[in-house]
Amino acid sequence: MLVMSLSTMLAQSQTLQPPAQLSLFMEGTVSTNLNERDMALSPDGSEMYYTLEAAQNAFSTILYRHKLPGNKWSAPEVAPFSGQFKDLEPAFSADGRRLFFSSNRPLSGTQAKDFDIWVVERAKDGSWSSPRNVGAPVNTKANEFYPSVALSGNLYFTSEYEKGVGKEDIYVCQWQDGKYTESVALDTAVNSKLWEFNAFVSPDEKFILFTSYGRKDDHGGGDLYISLRDAAGVWQPAKNMSMLNSPRLDYCPFVSFDQKILFFTSGRHDLPSTYEKPTTHAALVKAYNSVRNGSENIYWIDFQALVGSLK
């Protein structure tokens, strides 16, 4: 049933045409001088959800935009299920009927708690249900971040469990007999003794994109890596996606469901570390209010061309 639904959705026209070279995504409207991260595009390409985050992670909320006639997009709005607690990292199921995200909202009342994985479900009229905590064994007393769900129902996410391989790891809870199994850390082809986090798994679980920090081939701030899964279901040693990475943090990858577009978040900037001569207040204000001012932005690129360069 899921496969049929996904095939139908991918047959629909995709009007977003990704650039061959890495570029800011919708500069000035999605990527601005604020902190934007965590792109999630619906399977049919008609909706986008992403996170708007305050400085120093003081608050985060999920924004929503939908496609209008003429290949235009609506103005951003706070998603109907967000805006009260720290919400971030939206991720669609492959059938578009569920949207997972991470939140510190309480199970009841108004007192914030640790971060858990939550989900909203699509009603027949297109509206979203009230958020539901995914529950154990996915959620624990620790933090769970950055959900990514496969066609099988398997749920991948990030946490810092003591049972892990390193300081922060990528886990999977398999979906079996209508429920999740206990979380298992991916093996050392993906996880290491360092930090691995914010993974996107393809719907067929044939590849996984994630960020790692501190590896010998790291550009300095945390890099994007890719691991392929062989026919036996074994993850292969991850490779640094050096053509994308920068000295800043590059993370939060997402590939559109037709596998044409790669989105990710980066804090790279155009600000100089020195000036040839003393600058002015006006020049500083202009620079600090620019899009590439060191705030996080969403970037995009043609994923198929990128895959070809990785072979």
State what each model feature region is.
Residues 14-311:
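Short, conserved micro-motifs composed of acidic
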